Regions:
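Flexible interdomain linker/hinge and immediately adjacent N-terminus
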Residues: 1-12, 110-116
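Active-site-proximal segment of tyrosine recombinases
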Residues: 44-46, 141-142, 152, 160-170, ...
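Conserved tyrosine-mediated DNA breakage-rejoining catalytic core shared by Y-recombinases
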Residues: 47-86
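Short alpha-helical segment immediately N-terminal to, or the first helix within
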Residues: 34-35, 154-155, 168
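Basic, Lys/Arg- and aromatic-enriched nucleic-acid-binding interface segment
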Residues: 10-42
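Short, basic (Lys/Arg/His-rich) helix/loop patches that form interaction surfaces
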Residues: 18-22, 126-163
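Basic, alpha-helical nucleic-acid-contacting "clamp/cap" segments
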Residues: 72-112
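Catalytic-site neighborhood detector that most strongly recognizes the C-terminal catalytic loop/helix
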Residues: 69-71, 75, 169-194
Length: 196
């Protein structure tokens, strides 16, 4: 089994988003965009309720608003500001629904016998990601960690200090972060070569 990798090519990321928009799969678009723009674990994304995205005044969060998520694994509160990409995907998805209940899961898959909505499973999220990845020619190394790894990888490529990325991902060392986001020795060697 191949190790899960980040999506390194921004053209592939854009192509996946375009397909999701073209198919009006706004739920999938929000899940994808939220994952690659926040670094949240898939378990935290799938646990989100609509109430998390509504501010005290009853308004849907928009660019610049803060979202607080209690991480399931660490029990720590992760706070971050909603960026434009997340805000746009959130609005598209929210507007495509009929008044979602604040207690409903954002990423629902089906109703149970009692009529309540169930969140999609990790396997469902994995299948969805792989479907879109295959459509753009990414056939291997895609998993639910791909979203979080993609977040870290692109921060690193944009020059964000490794220590910040390490903190954002709650890693214990820079070496763990480099390995997690898929920075290879070959890429590090390229940096040395480019110093001329």
């Amino acid at each position: 089994m191949k190790e899960v990798q980040p999506i390194r090519d921004t053209k592939k990321i854009d192509a996946m988003k375009s397909i999701m928009k073209g198919e009006s799969n706004y739920r999938d678009l929000l899940l994808f965009v939220l994952g690659i723009n926040t670094g949240l674990r898939i378990s935290d994304i799938l646990a989100l309720k609509w109430g998390s995205f509504i501010n005290g005044g009853g308004r849907l969060l928009k660019t610049g608003d803060q979202l607080n998520v209690v991480e399931i694994k660490t029990k720590k509160v992760k706070s971050f500001v909603i960026n434009r990409s997340v805000a746009e995907a959130l609005k598209l998805y929210h507007d495509s629904l009929v008044s979602p209940n604040p207690d409903d899961p954002v990423f629902s898959s089906r109703k149970t016998d009692d009529g309540s909505l169930q969140p999609i499973t990790r396997i469902g999220a994995w299948q969805m990601l792989n479907r879109y990845a295959n459509m753009v020619g990414l056939d291997e190394g895609i998993g639910t960690h791909t979203l979080r790894k993609t977040f870290g990888y692109h921060l690193y490529k944009k020059g964000v200090a490794l220590e910040y990325i390490q903190k954002m991902l709650n890693h214990s060392s820079p070496a763990i972060t480099l390995r997690y986001i898929g920075i290879t020795q070959e890429q590090l060697n390229d940096i040395y070569v480019e110093l001329n």
